[in-house]
């Protein structure tokens, strides 16, 4: 736990008592502050009370006593409309912050020079965060991993000079962290997302920009217009900007050429790493993730040799191009996290041909219409869930398909067909381009079911992260 000593002897209001909310409340109290916490869910309030946290209905509170108001990132700050607690805080002139801001203030208070790498972006941030954490940890350094990736940031160990923090930040967390000042900040990409909570794409981009704007080193992927504009703007303001690209050859910065990762400066181009044979980092999208990780780790003082070792041993993340197993020459890949066509595109682009594609579930707007350019790579599709009839119409005569209905049937049929393929490496790919809740509780349960079905096949050799 990180006790928030920066708030010692002050009184703090807190709203939102989910998992991270209770952790935040405990950290505030451990630092010597008084707290009044609340939630709209009576069960959450009861859990907080049983954990020894002082609770009280903030609608009845005297807001003049509060030094700050700590808001859960899941609670609306501005859109579609501010939560009632936000209105009360603003009316009383009380500053509204979140758990990441509390971490930043405590770091500034007790160990302002400890390395702090913060990562954001619409896509790829969890993989990049996990990769950076893995590289640093593999060197034997003291590394703390948390934030939006699943570990509440205030449950980590307290800041000290030689302790590295690797923190994934959502737009909601950034919006509640006005003092965010990482040693290295990463903005991978921007596409429309969470606009119901941010009002417009411009506002969403402006919030994401804050993470890199106050960074010691701003590492920005420039393959979309929003990030390109942010990089240009920050560079013009005198901030140290390092550009990365998975698509463009840069005159200055870091870019990918296939599996080669290159650095360009002053007319010189040097190869700094290769992803050849690293199955957990297959595909152009992972080349961008690796570029960001390399630059961040270099800025934090790691050597290229240390970084290379970490890249090669990275196991990948579950449900994100996760290599589950092999049977003979057939590779089985779990990309259950791909819940829309945009997320499935990188998976299909990662294999040149002979893909046995398991796809379907609850379809999103547009279905798989945007993926037609990848259809020549697909040997056969196996359609599951509610989307089966719709996707069958989209595939038409372009791709052989069967309606498998269930994931278990799809795995069995795809494994058999791929095993009869004469290609050097056929791949059975679960990349559903759909939500899961017609047949599964969430994408994790769907991915687990795929993994279990694959590993139950006779002759499958389990794997994770190998080429």
Curated annotation (Swiss-Prot):
Protein name stated in the entry: UDP-N-acetylmuramoylalanine--D-glutamate ligase
Signal peptide, first to last residue: none
Binding of ATP, residues: 121-127
Keyword Phosphoprotein: no
Subcellular localization: Cytoplasm
Catalytic activity of the protein: UDP-N-acetyl-alpha-D-muramoyl-L-alanine + D-glutamate + ATP = UDP-N-acetyl-alpha-D-muramoyl-L-alanyl-D-glutamate + ADP + phosphate + H(+)
Main location per the UniProt record: cytoplasm
